[in-house]
């Protein structure tokens, strides 16, 4: 039908449950969009149920999570607008490059293949996970202290702790290992078709206080698209951290 708005698919990243998108879904629904926020493979319907069964989310990697969303998109009436946060942003970029979306927004998106910067704050935030190589096949959780550093550093401790309690879930560590080793693998799951000339527009956002995906990573991600004439833009929120999709700011 002429004038019908594209559906919207929200894609969460590691450690946040899909229901954390609920306020966004309501906002988009009020504007006339059909908005859905499916979880990753193995995610239960609630935060509590997902926490109770961490093994169900273990060992899922970037490719099978992407394929999970491909199947969801195939069931929609039209190609959607993709909005992803962190690793959800990376997956949104992959899907856009595969022509499974009409447009995409990567909010503090995880690094794709070709991004070589590894800022110290990112190393500190993930060191405990990489210290044990067997974590690659496990589900891992963040303590309130770890969440405060990686997500809530731009917030009060009280708000950070409240968000940790409300939204966090165990998540597969495998995507972290895949992204970290992308430079060593020609066919890395973190590879995105950045040269696609026919894809829809892409907006990347970055938080100036983000410890998990510092600005240097997002700026380098933007450079990976330099060989495509498709629209790619970048917006900075200078006072925001990685929690910007769920916090009060």
What are these regions (language model features)?
Residues 198, 204-206, 210:
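Short beta-strand/loop motif that positions the catalytic acidic residue
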Residues 211-220:
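Conserved alpha/beta-hydrolase "acid-adjacent" motif
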Residues 238-249:
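Catalytic histidine-centered segment of alpha/beta-hydrolase-like enzymes
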Residues 28-51:
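Conserved alpha/beta-hydrolase
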Residues 83-88, 92:
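Gly/Ala-rich beta-loop-alpha elbow adjacent to hydrolase catalytic centers
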Residues 100-137, 175-184:
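Flexible "cap/lid" loop of the alpha/beta hydrolase fold
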Residues 13-17, 86, 208-209:
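Active-site glycine-rich loops that stabilize anionic/oxyanionic intermediates
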Residues 44-80:
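Active-site loop/oxyanion-hole signature of alpha/beta-hydrolase fold enzymes
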């Amino acid at each position: 039908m002429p004038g019908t708005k594209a559906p919207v698919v929200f894609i969460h990243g590691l450690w946040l449950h899909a229901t954390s998108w609920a306020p966004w879904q309501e906002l988009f629904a009020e504007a006339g969009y059909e908005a859905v926020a499916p979880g990753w493979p193995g995610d239960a319907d609630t935060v509590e149920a997902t926490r109770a069964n961490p093994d169900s989310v273990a060992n899922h990697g970037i490719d099978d999570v992407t394929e999970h969303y491909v199947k969801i998109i195939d069931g929609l009436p039209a190609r959607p607008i993709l909005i992803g946060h962190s690793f959800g942003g990376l997956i949104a970029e992959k899907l856009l490059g595969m022509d499974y979306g009409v447009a995409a927004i990567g909010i503090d998106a995880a690094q794709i293949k070709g991004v070589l910067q590894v800022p110290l704050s990112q190393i500190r935030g993930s060191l405990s996970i990489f210290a044990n190589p067997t974590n690659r096949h496990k589900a891992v959780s963040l303590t309130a202290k770890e969440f405060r550093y990686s997500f809530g550093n731009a917030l009060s401790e009280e708000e950070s702790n409240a968000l940790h309690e409300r939204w966090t879930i165990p998540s597969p560590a495998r995507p972290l290992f895949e992204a970290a080793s992308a430079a060593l693998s020609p066919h890395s799951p973190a590879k995105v078709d950045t040269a696609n000339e026919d894809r829809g527009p892409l907006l990347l956002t970055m938080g100036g206080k983000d410890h998990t995906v510092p600005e240097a990573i997002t700026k380098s991600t933007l450079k990976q698209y330099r060989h495509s004439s498709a629209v790619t833009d970048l917006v900075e929120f200078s006072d925001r951290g990685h929690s910007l999709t769920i916090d009060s700011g």
